Amino acid sequence: MSLQSIRYKRGMLQVLDQLQVPHVERYIPVSTAKEGWHVIKEMHVRGAPAIAIVAVLSLSIELTELMDHEKLSTEADEVEAYILEKLDYLVTSRPTAVNLSDAAIKLKTLVQKRKQIGDPKGKDLAEAYVEAAEKMLIDDAMDNHRLGDFGATWIVNNTPVGKEGKKVGVLTHCNTGSLATAGYGTALGVIRSLLASDKLEHAYCTETRPYNQGARLTAFELVHDKIPATLITDSMAASLLAQKGAGLAAIVVGADRVVANGDTANKIGTYQLAVLAKYHGVKFIVAAPRTTIDLRTKEGEDIIIEERAKSEVTRITGPRISDLGKNEENITLETVNIAAPGIDVWNPAFDVTPYDLIDAIVTEVGVAEKNADGLFQLEKLFGFP
């Protein structure tokens, strides 16, 4: 049974509380856009694709509730303004992840176009929104399977280990699997596709400080799916790449935003992995759906980088050792301080990897590689010349 970060049916949305995974599997009910904003901002849900889906579905639940109780305005103008205002609000929850703003723009456009058809009532606009949001959930899972297959094929065909017909080793960072998407995953989806085609030798995942998404979430998924894998600390990556016997063919990461020239914002620590990959001759691959590509932003220096609370670096949360193996209801999670009191902290959530350190950008429609001039032409992924 696959892991689910999002449980949805019309009128019901539940989000897996990823702050408690892997020790406790608890789902948080979400019934309004405000509740959606908070589960995203407080990182109960994370991963750019999952953030977008939870955001748009939270408003879907709110609109469905209003329609069911006949509290929705009958005026199309009022419902249009209501939806647009809520979408703008939801986008503020995590500004770096472009998937959310992309989904909001698409849904705004849909609602505005629906208002121009015939003489719609407020309910017509709300129903159009709900149907479109639900389709985004379905499409994301399907796109991830295609993306995973494209990425796996590229690694096999474009790395020395793969060309020799050997199984490949892959290193990944943060969490990009079923818990970060509607299902299957992006970078972790590539690893799943390698395993499915019997091309995976071993997967490695970084712990991904300071939030430990790799140690808590990616490791959880790898164990759940019985994928051969090893956890390393972030500072061990260079030593791993230097091990000739490791058989590492590629580093595969996800993305929160890929801009027009290919510069990529992703979880803090991604940039240093790209530098290490370049030095050691290991392919560095970004795996992300087209919803993560932001052609409106030209270069990485224009990306807004979210900075988070100092306490995320100075404290850590987990169960007491004595509680391990107990039933979930008997597990107590405790937070302890791990840093010297009074020390200053810098805590950017993301960094930007320059395009020239990236070998390929894998999407659900194919793989983008640099041209003879060393430049990505990402607009071609959207059918532009």
Curated annotation (Swiss-Prot):
EC number: 5.3.1.23
GO terms for cellular component: cytoplasm; nucleus
InterPro entries: IF-2B-related, IF-M1Pi, IF_2B-like_C, Initiation_fac_2B_a/b/d, M1Pi_N, NagB/RpiA_transferase-like
Listed GO MF terms: S-methyl-5-thioribose-1-phosphate isomerase activity
Keyword Isomerase: yes
Cytoplasm found in the keyword field: yes
Location in or out of the cell: Cytoplasm; Nucleus
Protein name in UniProt: Methylthioribose-1-phosphate isomerase
Originating organism: Arthroderma otae (strain ATCC MYA-4605 / CBS 113480)
Recorded metabolic or biological pathway in which this protein acts: Amino-acid biosynthesis; L-methionine biosynthesis via salvage pathway; L-methionine from S-methyl-5-thio-alpha-D-ribose 1-phosphate: step 1/6
Site location (Transition state stabilizer): 174
SUPFAM superfamilies reported for this sequence: NagB/RpiA/CoA transferase-like
Catalytic activity reported: 5-(methylsulfanyl)-alpha-D-ribose 1-phosphate = 5-(methylsulfanyl)-D-ribulose 1-phosphate
Entry keyword set: Amino-acid biosynthesis, Cytoplasm, Isomerase, Methionine biosynthesis, Nucleus
Gene Ontology biological process terms, A to Z: L-methionine salvage from methylthioadenosine
Protein function: Catalyzes the interconversion of methylthioribose-1-phosphate (MTR-1-P) into methylthioribulose-1-phosphate (MTRu-1-P).
Family: Belongs to the eIF-2B alpha/beta/delta subunits family. MtnA subfamily.
Active site: 256
